[in-house]
């Protein structure tokens, strides 16, 4: 796990990508820019096990993964896990509109295209975590 330097109010993020260099790159960006502790998964099976056992504030998920693939991981997370409502941000080289639309229909909350633009990634993750933590308001 890669931990944020500031220990106050850290967020837990699961990063799923089959390329170790990409996992580490994403984790470093988030640890240095946001208060994030990153858990890294290199396989779909590992991602499903982690998502099934631990709650996260956000999940970054690559689509093109060996094994069952990113779409199936997304569907399983949305079907039954402690992360059923956790924001899932797709991180992929596939950047066409049809792929983005398919991801949103499958339950993704946001999409960041590779190559990663640091500011875009940080803004997207920050917005998704903030949106999840907004208190619900009730009418009187």
What feature does the model see in each segment?
Residues 20-39:
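Two-component/phosphorelay signaling modules centered on CheY-like receiver
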Residues 40-58:
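Acidic, metal-coordinating helix/loop segments flanking the phosphotransfer/catalytic sites
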Residues 55-57, 81-87:
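His-Asp phosphorelay/catalytic-motif detector in bacterial-type signaling
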Residues 65:
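Receiver (REC) domain active-site loop signature in two-component systems and cognate sites
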Residues 98, 116-125:
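C-terminal output helix
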């Amino acid at each position: 796990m890669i931990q944020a330097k500031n220990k106050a109010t850290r967020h837990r993020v699961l990063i799923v990508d089959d390329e170790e260099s990409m996992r580490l790159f994403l984790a470093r960006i988030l640890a240095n820019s946001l208060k994030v502790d990153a858990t890294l998964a290199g396989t779909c099976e590992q991602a499903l096990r982690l998502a099934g056992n631990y709650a996260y504030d956000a999940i970054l998920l690559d689509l093109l993964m060996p094994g069952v693939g990113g779409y199936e991981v997304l569907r399983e997370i949305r079907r039954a896990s402690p992360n059923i409502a956790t924001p899932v941000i797709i991180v992929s080289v596939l950047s066409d509109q049809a792929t983005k639309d398919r991801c949103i229909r499958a339950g993704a909350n946001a999409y960041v295209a590779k190559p990663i633009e640091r500011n875009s990634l940080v803004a997207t993750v920050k917005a998704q975590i903030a949106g999840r933590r907004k208190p619900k308001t009730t009418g009187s």
